[in-house]
Amino acid sequence: MTADNPNQGQIAEHAARQYLQQRGLIFVEQNVRYRFGEIDIVMKDGSDWVFVEVKYRSASQYGGAVNSLSAAQAGRIRKAASHYIQLNRIDAICRFDVIAADPQGIQWIRDAF
């Protein structure tokens, strides 16, 4: 989770979780950390596992939250998700979503990377 300050990040993650739950996803786990990466939120969408990266920006300059995920960050999230899948012996379809939040609202990007 990237934010202008940690408190805003926690608020954005909570809002993202509620947003996704209101749209039918089931919460599994939050803030899963490994030495090589972190998964902000783990959800289930039917039988599919969804690894969610939450991005928050207080302003839209420099592309805002939507454009703030780098290839390196996506790689770390993929690596963390792969480890999570192995540890939990998950044999199902998985996807990576991004929740981009700013003061104007939330944007859900399915299959973001």
UniProtKB/Swiss-Prot annotation:
GO terms for molecular function: nucleic acid binding. Pfam families: UPF0102. This is UPF0102 protein Shal_4069. Signal peptide: none annotated. Disulfide bonds: none annotated. SUPFAM superfamilies: Restriction endonuclease-like. Transmembrane segments: none annotated. InterPro entries: Restrct_endonuc-II-like (IPR011335), tRNA_endonuc-like_dom_sf (IPR011856), UPF0102_YraN-like (IPR003509). It comes from Shewanella halifaxensis (strain HAW-EB4). HAMAP family: UPF0102. Belongs to the UPF0102 family.
